[in-house]
Design a protein with these regions (language model features):
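Bacterial N-terminal signal peptides that target proteins for export
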Residues: 1-8
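Residue-level hotspots at or immediately adjacent to binding/recognition sites across diverse folds
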Residues: 21-363
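N-terminal signal peptide c-region/cleavage motif recognized by signal peptidases
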Residues: 14-21
Length: 363
């Protein structure tokens, strides 16, 4: 009996030691700064933008943020988290925001060199609960949407900060939007000091994921699953659904006064030249997933795919695309354009620089 007792005591001590060791080893990525790595420029990057001041900023895995003033020499930024980052927006040369997993919203005040946390999943859960609780109390039996949303927010808090933001777009240094999984829509009008939940204003009763937000004339457009396209109505403050001809997932939207281009799964893309009143299917020449797109200065559009392809439209109407020769098949997830038809794409192998002016000259 004494031997069994001693063995049990030893087992308990060993388990406690293991638990203590595990607690010591685990570091919450929301509280752990991104590690500096010489390989950050060739590791997984998901989003990229070019600031109004001409700087390139890319974001990606484990909190990696890179910046460059010439698209050749890249520098790693100081980032207070090590969660995956997926999107970045700079409305001015110095002020920018990045979003990603764990409900993270980061802000930079120095052109992307360093970042601070404005929101994370722990505070996001409390924000959602505070928003939905009074609406749930007023909800009728026939319209239980707010009650279900409150239950979902409470479950989110219990399970931990795993809900991601998937995109961010700022109009100016004060006003911006962040969107994400399960109809997550936030807006700020004070540079991110406070965030307002707008999810109840969206025509998205199934709480579909929102993959991208784009701005046109200070108006927000959101795209997501099951062909969802939402247009902000400045008069009512609601995000109203626009009918689209495709029932699959949209991963991106290009919004210009002369063109709206939706793109997503299986090489599917549709163009509208009348603000979404009518749509024409686009010949992309691929069955691969279209992950991101951007406009060149001459109006042509460039798209990148999960197959690692770079597609360029023949003209500004974006009715037909052709493949630009690339020397890799690594997936591409983000694209931004600069002067003289230069483009920076990011993906599984990090940063790629393309000279699309040279491609046009060789045709």
């Amino acid at each position: 009996m004494g031997f069994i007792y001693q063995a049990l005591v030893a087992l308990v001590v060993a388990c406690c030691a293991c638990a203590a060791s595990a607690d010591t080893l685990f570091r919450d990525p929301l509280d752990t700064p991104a590690l500096h790595s010489d390989k950050a420029g060739t590791s997984l990057l998901v989003g990229v933008t070019r600031t109004p001041g001409g700087r390139w900023v890319a974001v990606g895995r484990r909190g990696h943020v890179l910046w460059s003033d010439d698209a050749h020499a890249w520098h790693q930024a100081k980032v207070p988290v090590s969660v995956d980052l997926v999107a970045v927006s700079f409305p001015s040369p110095e002020h920018g925001w990045a979003v990603g997993h764990g409900g993270v919203i980061l802000r930079s005040l120095d052109g992307g060199r360093s970042w601070e946390t404005q929101l994370d999943g722990r505070r996001l859960a409390d924000l959602l609960i505070a928003h939905w609780r009074p609406l749930a109390a007023q909800a009728s039996e026939t319209e239980p949407g707010a009650r279900l949303a409150l239950q979902d927010a409470e479950r989110f808090k219990d399970e931990g900060p795993g809900r991601p933001f998937l995109d961010v777009a700022f109009i100016d240094e004060q006003t911006g939007y962040a969107v994400g999984a399960y109809n997550l829509i936030l807006m700020t009008t004070d540079a991110g000091a406070h965030w307002q939940v707008l999810s109840d204003r969206a025509d998205n009763p199934s709480a579909l994921h929102l993959n991208a937000v784009r701005l046109l004339d200070r108006q927000a457009y959101l795209v997501g699953e099951q062909g969802l396209l939402l247009q902000e109505n400045p008069g009512t403050g609601r995000f109203e659904a626009i009918q689209t001809p495709y029932g699959g997932t949209w991963f991106g939207l290009l919004a210009r006064p002369d063109l709206m281009l939706l793109f997503g799964l299986r090489g599917t893309a549709y163009a509208s030249h009348d603000q979404g009143a009518s749509w024409t299917q686009v010949d992309t020449g691929t069955q691969g997933t279209l992950n991101a797109g951007a406009s060149l200065a001459d109006g042509r559009v460039v798209l990148v795919t999960a197959e690692g392809r770079l597609l360029l439209s023949d003209d500004a109407s974006a009715g037909h695309f052709r493949a630009v020769p690339v020397d890799s098949t690594q997936p591409l997830y983000g694209i931004a354009t600069g002067q003289n038809a230069t483009a920076v794409a990011v993906g599984a192998a990090g940063v790629r620089l393309f000279d699309l002016a040279a491609d046009a000259a060789s045709r």
